[in-house]
Regions:
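Glycine/tyrosine- and acidic-biased, solvent-exposed loop/turn segments at the edges of beta-strands
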Residues: 1-125, 131-140
């Protein structure tokens, strides 16, 4: 009951728009999402949860649009996908994962348009080095 009472403080601004910190709950009482509104728009860091309490997705909003790095998770807690948004559009490098944690595929977006996809087996030497945080010269190739 106290969590619900917290939601009743400063929910709306003088124009009747959502403003400030909000929490939403599933009917079972489990936290559904939490984050801030500014003048009716989501703004700042938000987290959304599966009904079992596991994190579903997290990321940042700017004036109601997704912006920056976002991550989604399977209901068991494993990473499902991650990537970037710019002004609400998918943009840049994205990765998708199986629920086992294994990389499924990766791709690249420009201003919301899907440009390129690579299978896991098509990683370049530069991409492998970047993933492990080392230089290409540090890679050791076994034949």
């Amino acid at each position: 009951m106290e969590k619900q009472a917290l939601n009743l403080i400063n929910l709306y601004n003088e124009r009747g728009k959502r403003h400030g910190y909000w929490e939403y709950y599933y009917e079972n009482g489990q936290l559904m999402s939490k984050g801030h509104y500014v003048n009716g728009n989501r703004d700042g860091y938000w987290e959304v949860y599966h009904s079992n309490g596991q994190l579903l997705r997290k990321g940042r909003y700017v004036n109601g649009e997704r912006d920056g790095h976002w991550e989604w998770y399977w209901s068991g807690g494993q990473l499902e996908k991650k990537g970037h948004y710019v002004n609400g559009n998918t943009d840049g490098y994205w990765e998708w994962y199986y629920s086992s944690g294994q990389l499924s595929r990766k791709g690249h977006f420009v201003n919301g348009e899907f440009i390129k996809e690579k299978e896991q087996t098509e990683l370049t030497m530069d991409e492998i080095a970047e993933r492990f945080g080392i230089s290409v010269s540090q890679l050791k190739i076994k034949k």
